[in-house]
């Protein structure tokens, strides 16, 4: 497991793409044509804990699947930007909504539509299997592939930096 080289105690918010980050890059299709996604339970645990501990979490995705909205809303995520055609606009809306600076935001993306946000946020991160163009912009490349724990990786490191990871109330 590698460690993020950044003062993580400064991070107040994390934003994530879904496809290729919080779900794998393979998207099975339901017979109706609706894309289906798998999600990582450990990513989910870390995200809901971060919400409970007061960090701002956003989902910024080009997808519009109702199942994705339901999943992340159930984890307590309030800032869901679905159908995001130009992600930088939604990133800035999220940042400005909470009066954050770019240096206080970690963003994790995996493909070309994420690059503009990654160039603006303070801590651009990506999964191990991100495209080369994204890896060249990332300050941290997770040990895990998309949909296989890369979200947990970065959330856990941020919570540890804030002294919130294994706090007594992390168990209930």
Give residue spans per PLM region:
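Non-catalytic pre-domain segments flanking phosphatase-related domains
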Residues: 1-18, 164-172
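Asp-based phosphoryl-transfer active-site loop
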Residues: 9-26, 118, 151
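Short coil/turn segments at beta-strand junctions that form active-site/ligand-binding loops
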Residues: 10-12, 55, 103-104
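Conserved functional loop/turn residues at catalytic and ligand-binding sites
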Residues: 15, 54, 63, 76, ...
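Short secondary-structure boundary segments
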Residues: 18, 62-63, 84, 128-131
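A positional/architectural concept
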Residues: 22-53, 62
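Mg2+-dependent phosphoryl-transfer enzymes with acidic/Ser/Thr/Gly-rich catalytic loops
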Residues: 33-40, 74-75, 79-81, 88-172
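Substrate-recognition element of Asp-dependent hydrolases with the DxDx(T/V) motif
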Residues: 47-71, 81-82, 118
